[in-house]
Amino acid sequence: MEKPALEVQLKTLPNSPGVYQYFDKNGKILYVGKAKNLKKRVTSYFNKNHDSHRIGVMVKKICEIKHIVVASETDALLLENNLIKKHQPRFNVMLKDDKTYPWICIKNERFPRVFPTRRLIKDGSEYYGPFTSFKTVNTLLDLIKGLYKLRTCNYDLAEDKIRNGKYKVCLEYHLGNCLGPCEGFQPEEEYNNNIEAIRQIVKGNFKDSLQRFRNQMKQHSEKMEFEDAQRIKNKIDVLENYQAKSTVVNPRINNVDVFSVVSDEGYGYVNFLQLSHGAIIRSHTIEMKKKLDESDRELLELAIVEIRQRFSSNSTEIYVPFKVDVGEELKIVIPKLGDKKKIVELSQRNAKYFRQERFKQMKIVDPDRHVNRVMAQMKEDLRLGKEPRHIECFDNSNIQGTNPVAACVVFKNGKPSKKDYRKFNIKTVEGPDDFASMEEVVFRRYRRLLNEGEDLPELIIVDGGKGQLSSGVKALETLGLRGKIAIIGIAKRLEEIFYPEDSIPLYLDKKSETLKIIQQLRNEAHRFGITFHRNKRSKTALNTELESIQGIGEKTVVELLTHFRSLKRIKEASQKELADVVGSAKAAIICNFYHSE
């Protein structure tokens, strides 16, 4: 692959269903495709030799890849069709004809007909779907026809024409497939009740019909009519597996713009979905750099105006996740339920994916840019004199004062530097005293760094509130480092940030990158300290029992544990096995201790 930018786009594609679009150097769409897994499908074009010359030619022309994330593979198929018909890409052949996916139509007329169609006509008729194949449509229509007797003729069944006897029943009536509304044999109310039941079925509301089918199946089974019972069972299976509609296309939603936003400390990401005749025809996401810590609402209002101008949108209705003010001529809808809500959620998913991909691309193309941004943000958020490129965090660990230890973890440029981690046994403190323990380890840590001429951190974090912070400050003061290294404390309950000699804590935004890094430091220090403490307790328990044996010293204990790895194995070892490690005399002492009556 010749273009680094393209390689980055491939690496950051999501493992999700969706539609991808290939563009040439002039920004013209070359190809639109669907995928169950975008990353696998798109990457496959660039990872193998192609039997088709056409594909090879197309791949050489690709300069940019865009994609739209959807909820399912079916949605991807439908959206692919919409985009191909909209843009007519050069390399698309299979779906470039004038065919479209089928719908089920309930005609706007007296005694409505129910039939499949590829055309959506604005005459007040109801359309349900779309379906990915006529096989699915016909299966459902066969089911409906088996349940309800509907007319198939195209007569105008006006009341006066029926009353005047203009029509005669046809063969369908004599075959039992129609109840003869054309001659007035079926009341209009009864027919309309059947149509309402059909509406519920094609919309996916099957509860009543399923219950009726189950009752029928039970009755057939009780009468030993097993073939009829199986026929009803097949209908139940069809209903249960049928999905009435797609989150991508809905004919009742027409000429609408959909907007959503996600943001972090520095940037906002606004996604735009354009719907025409109930189908998504465009998805576009923009990145907006915050200047004055703008809210999501402010970002969305700015973006809506910009995007509508850019794409010359004439929609008079927009869907958004919350209230915005963008002009009186627009109808603002904040969906709470149903299809409209699902479309807004789809827009939000695309905005989130775009944001994730931007971060991944940034780290691949310019890793320093991301680090620099985070460091600058931490300096500003924490009111520091310089960027905290080197941060150290301390945590104490003990249980009722037993085996007191402490841990120091080190982050450099926002990432753990595990080779610099340090653990401490508390030496000068008796009993459970977190404050004195914190003072000891901070003092020992930086006395050593000073003595060895090592670099000092720009920021120290102590896990705890005002008391632990005061202890850390006292240690720095003793070393003459107070004011030379910034030090803060973080209290767990409310994630409060404490500063020396400041009784009012700082509360960072929960979405803040700064808070996330501080929490990561605190959690890592806690994990490292707990692991050390647990290991020390286990070792102490082993050593205490072995060293209590008269004639067995520390050196012998170490030899035994190194060889046998556990106290249980030492107890189970034979005298000969023990003698091979520590000699026959000590082996006899150990065996006598564990195996004497």
UniProtKB/Swiss-Prot annotation:
Any single biological process term in GO: SOS response
Keywords from the named record: Cytoplasm, DNA damage, DNA excision, DNA repair, Excision nuclease, SOS response
Highest rank taxon of the organism: Bacteria
Domain UVR: 207-242
Intracellular or extracellular location(s): Cytoplasm
PROSITE patterns: GIY_YIG, UVR, UVRC
GO cellular component: cytoplasm; excinuclease repair complex
Keyword Cytoplasm in record: yes
A molecular function (GO) term: excinuclease ABC activity
One Pfam family it belongs to: UVR
Keyword DNA damage in record: yes
Major location (coarse): cytoplasm
Residue span, GIY-YIG domain: 15-93
PANTHER family: UVRABC SYSTEM PROTEIN C, UVRC/OXIDOREDUCTASE
Function: The UvrABC repair system catalyzes the recognition and processing of DNA lesions. UvrC both incises the 5' and 3' sides of the lesion. The N-terminal half is responsible for the 3' incision and the C-terminal half is responsible for the 5' incision.
Entry similarity comment: Belongs to the UvrC family.
Assembly description: Interacts with UvrB in an incision complex.
The protein, known as: UvrABC system protein C
Provenance organism: Christiangramia forsetii (strain DSM 17595 / CGMCC 1.15422 / KT0803) (Gramella forsetii)
Origin organism lineage: Bacteria, Pseudomonadati, Bacteroidota, Flavobacteriia, Flavobacteriales
